[in-house]
Amino acid sequence: REKEWKRAIDAALALQMSGAGAYQKEIAQFHCEIAQDELVHVHADAALQTLDKALSYDRNNVRAMMLIGDALMAKGDAEAALQAWRRVEQQSVPHVALVAQRLMDGYRAVGRAREGVHLLKTYLSEAPSIDLLEVVFKAVLELDGTLSANQLVSDELRRTPTLLGLDKLIEARLMDAPPEGRAELSLIKSLVGSYAQKLARYRCNHCGFKAKQFYWQCPGCSQWESYAPRRSEELSVMNQG
């Protein structure tokens, strides 16, 4: 696989030299593919060198910064990993949703979970996201209990009304619902949840292909970086606003 990506890099560079267009974004992604393979084989130092090359072609490549954090964490440097993951906000605020769980896990690892929650709440206020809310919700539930977790979801739903948010609110309410009201809430949850899941898709801006998970390269049209880091329903709400 590494040889394939290196050939892709050489081909893209040749196209650029011939004046056929700019391929900086693609070349950076090819380097990320190599680095990801290096991380799988526990070659963190090699991955860091490869990711530096990726950023030399595209300094705003979010994936490269996320993988730098992964490599640093693999080397046991949690503080440096946290710094790398926090830089994602400087590159693209909406993409912090993709790195939220890494950040929360990192802050737990260094014994500063509340600092992590505070940071993620700040991100949530800047770039509402159901994926980001999910991470913050679980952390608040763990640190402060169901009442605070309920309040968090309720506030977010008022600010960004989506079916996905309503589904999360019902889940939160179920946690401390009295026995006599739990059956009805569970029924509502199953009904809302079935519709919400249909909207919980990432959508390619190039070909419209929808997927349950986020892709750096669309499996439908092979375009790079064509997925917004938000679910389709959230994008619809933003466009209406």
What do the PLM-derived regions correspond to, one by one?
Residues 5-8, 47, 81, 116, ...:
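Single-residue signature of alpha-solenoid repeat helices
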Residues 2-5, 44, 78, 113, ...:
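TPR-repeat structural position
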Residues 31, 38, 72, 107, ...:
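Residue at a conserved register position within TPR or TPR-like alpha-solenoid repeats
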Residues 59, 93-94, 127-128, 160-161:
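Short coil turns that delineate tetratricopeptide repeat
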Residues 14-17, 52-56, 87-90, 124-125, ...:
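Conserved structural position within tetratricopeptide repeats
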Residues 22-25, 29, 46-49, 63, ...:
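Start-of-helix register in tetratricopeptide repeats
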